[in-house]
A protein has these predicted regions:
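Select subsegments of transmembrane alpha-helices in polytopic membrane proteins
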Residues: 58-71
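Short, Lys/Arg-rich, polar N-terminal cytosolic tail immediately upstream
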Residues: 1-10
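Short cysteine-rich clusters marking metal-coordination/redox-active sites
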Residues: 24-28, 44-47
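Short amphipathic alpha-helical coupling elements at transmembrane boundaries
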Residues: 42-49, 115, 119
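Cytosol/matrix-facing juxtamembrane amphipathic
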Residues: 91-141
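Cys/His-rich microdomains that often coordinate metals
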Residues: 31, 51
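Short, flexible, mixed-charge glycine/proline-rich loop motifs
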Residues: 11-21, 33-39
Length: 141
């Protein structure tokens, strides 16, 4: 794992892969922002970087990632079902189940993946990194 207070930006694929495994996209720390499956901390437990970064609507990006993953999964299921000759009723039951359950299960992952995309688009400022270091020094991730 990288040093928690690193200032160089990881590559986008690395940040996305870290996000898929609920790790901090910046430092790779386990658990990142989560104290439970859905309960979030204000900062990464390892590097201290804040997930909010003074922007309104950050949650919208995570929700959008969830929509893309859910729709992609449903479309893949439907294509597979049509090619395999699955009857219409089972096809729709599974697709409906995926539409309801998939976003709920994947929310923490889509959240950390979106955080990685956001970090790639808008690199943390020196002020963000200084606040992260101060939060770690104060013992309040």
């Amino acid at each position: 794992m990288n040093s928690p207070l690193r200032h160089d930006r990881p590559a986008l694929p690395r940040m996305i892969i870290r996000g898929l495994f609920r790790r901090c996209a910046w430092c790779g720390g386990k658990g990142a922002f989560f104290k439970s499956w859905y309960g979030k901390n204000d900062r990464c437990n390892t590097c201290g970087l804040s997930w909010q970064r003074n922007l309104e609507g950050f949650e919208l990006g995570a929700a959008t990632m969830g929509v893309f993953i859910t729709f992609g999964t449903i479309i893949a299921w439907m294509i597979f079902s049509v090619i395999a000759g699955v009857a219409l009723v089972p096809l729709l039951v599974v697709a409906g189940g995926l539409a309801v359950v998939w976003p709920v299960l994947w929310y923490p992952n889509t959240y950390t993946v979106w955080f990685g995309v956001d970090l790639f688009i808008r690199r943390p400022s020196e002020e963000d990194l200084a606040e992260a270091e101060a939060a770690l020094a104060a013992g309040r991730p």
